[in-house]
Amino acid sequence: MRHGMSGRKLNRDKSARKALFVSLANALLKHEQIKTTLPKAKDARPIVEKLITLGKRGDLHARRQAYAFLRDDKVVAKLFAVIGPRYKERQGGYCRVLKAGFRYGDCAPMAIIELVDRDLAAKGTDSGPTADKKADADEE
């Protein structure tokens, strides 16, 4: 019996699942709205909300905890400089998951996960390369 077991395995082992949620959290905090499958969105939501709560705290220990999970300086800087202060008065519920139909090909249920009071003017703008792309460019 599976009483009391929360979360989904998503057909991955533990390390692949952690990498998936790190990637989803980075993308959501960078772009403030992403499209993914419904189970991934439902599982990523509490992770991102805990990161935003760290951003609201704003102290050094919270910043180090966020960096230990995200591993991207620019996303952590945005989390603490922009996103954290934006939700200073809101007590939780920073993300919403909207159902977005089914994917053509495998009919997987899709969802849009977005930050609640996101910046609509920034939609579609790219906030620059990620840390991985920058490191690859420096090596070449």
From Swiss-Prot:
Top-rank taxon, per record: Bacteria
Any one GO cellular component localisation term in the record: cytosolic large ribosomal subunit
GO molecular function: structural constituent of ribosome
Gene Ontology biological process terms, A to Z: translation
Family annotation (InterPro entries): Ribosomal_bL17 (IPR000456), Ribosomal_bL17_CS (IPR047859), Ribosomal_bL17_sf (IPR036373)
One Pfam family, short name: Ribosomal_L17
Keywords associated with the record: Ribonucleoprotein, Ribosomal protein
Matches recorded under SUPFAM superfamilies: Prokaryotic ribosomal protein L17
Family affiliation: Belongs to the bacterial ribosomal protein bL17 family.
Assembly notes: Part of the 50S ribosomal subunit. Contacts protein L32.
Protein name listed in UniProt: Large ribosomal subunit protein bL17
Species, as recorded: Paramagnetospirillum magneticum (strain ATCC 700264 / AMB-1) (Magnetospirillum magneticum)
